Amino acid sequence: MLPADICWAVRPSSTAAYTTRLVVYRPSDPANFNGTVVVEWLDASGGADVSADWIKVHIELIRNGFAWVGVSAQAVGVEGPIVGTNASGPIGGSKAIDPARYASLDHPGDSYSYDIFSQAGLAVRHRNGPDPLAGLQTRRVIAVGYPQSADRIATHVNSMQPLAHIFDGFLVHSRSLAAGNLSDGPQPVAVPNPWFLLAADAKNLESAATHSAIGIAR
């Protein structure tokens, strides 16, 4: 993992074609749109895309005229296998859950995830191709992610944003001590000093409730 609070010198590497998924909620009446688009890096830590922040704040976003775009930025959310089931059905990557609907999706790997997320931000700000917002006039674009996705957003803030300036603001929601890796390749490890990871009480309570819900003994 990379240190979370340093601006890094980055450069382009290889290129790859991709097709991913955007999930969009927007006001049906343009008069109700407040001009702000929230772009969420969908959390794929459980083997499937989860709109963690949308779940927590969607009532507020709808009530106040925001648009929300969920981005399948990571490979496992697109290409991953079925990892379980719940009341709604199977859990896993989009192509495994619904092969017919998502047959055209193609993710080249997480080394490209930051650029995929950046291009999703550009798609809602400067719409030169298909328009995910159906003509709504965007004034602000905010990137959000929770919690594994927050690590990725932290990396985006420190590496991509200084170069591309795509987003107007960021919500880095409950990240870990470090930031997300920049590529799929081997990562340097350097921990010269002892360190502590402090989680707020609310996070601990949330974790306990989750473990209880899925039957993990504590």
Across the structure, where does each feature detected by a protein language model lie?
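C-terminal His-loop and adjacent cap/lid subdomain of alpha/beta-hydrolase
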Residues: 1-218
